[in-house]
């Protein structure tokens, strides 16, 4: 998927800063020939900066970066966790509809990624159901579901995933976008590997986020 086109169709924010729940739909078309131009406007306190902050968190997650400690400050007051959900279209030899969502909690003033979920479907196959892979850092027995994944990967790769899980938790990084996870998935979960690699490349090369703390003017491209 070296020449893939990635589009963000919509995103949902829960319990982030002053936004208890918000959803923005960027474009109703799943496939577009031209780039979207998105303008966010509204009165002070309406959540414009929160949207930019949410994209910064997304970028850090998909690039496999360590979440900054101040990420915990984005969790809404009196809430334990925040949740971000992004709906993508990936267009290439295979076209996929993808939803990537994750939840972050505050543990002693450090961000803890308690869950990541990847739901995908090949958009050209209308009769096929969606597939979902869920990672949980707070579950000992069902930390990666469906459990058939472990049987597909075998003992050695499952052990490598457990090591990757511990590293991701210690370093406050995404599990799905850990390089070791991609290596474990690539032979048995080809579509998942392609999707994760495509989203990673999109975050690194096409998703630019400048927060208000970096500039007097906030831009989101």
Could you tell me what each predicted segment is?
Residues 4-6, 17-19, 93-97, 108-113:
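Coil-to-beta-strand transition motifs
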């Amino acid at each position: 998927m070296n020449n893939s086109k990635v589009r963000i169709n919509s995103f949902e924010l829960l319990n982030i800063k002053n936004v208890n729940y918000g959803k923005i739909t960027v474009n109703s078309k799943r496939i577009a020939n031209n780039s979207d131009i998105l303008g966010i406007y509204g009165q002070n306190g309406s959540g414009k900066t929160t949207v930019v902050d949410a994209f910064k968190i997304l970028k850090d997650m998909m690039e496999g970066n360590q979440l900054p400690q101040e990420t915990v400050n984005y969790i809404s007051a009196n809430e334990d966790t925040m949740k971000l959900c992004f709906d993508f279209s990936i267009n290439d030899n295979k076209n996929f509809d993808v939803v990537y969502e994750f939840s972050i909690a505050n543990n002693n003033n450090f961000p803890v990624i308690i869950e990541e979920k990847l739901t995908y479907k090949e958009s050209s196959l209308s009769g096929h159901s969606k597939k979902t892979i869920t990672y949980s850092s707070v579950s000992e027995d069902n930390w990666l579901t469906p459990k058939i994944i472990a049987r597909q990967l075998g003992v050695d790769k499952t052990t490598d995933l457990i090591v990757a899980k511990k590293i991701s938790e210690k370093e406050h990084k995404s599990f799905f976008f850990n390089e070791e996870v991609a290596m474990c998935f690539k032979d048995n979960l080809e579509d998942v590997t392609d999707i994760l690699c495509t989203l990673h490349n999109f975050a690194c090369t096409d998703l630019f986020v400048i927060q208000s703390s970096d500039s007097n003017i906030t831009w989101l491209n």
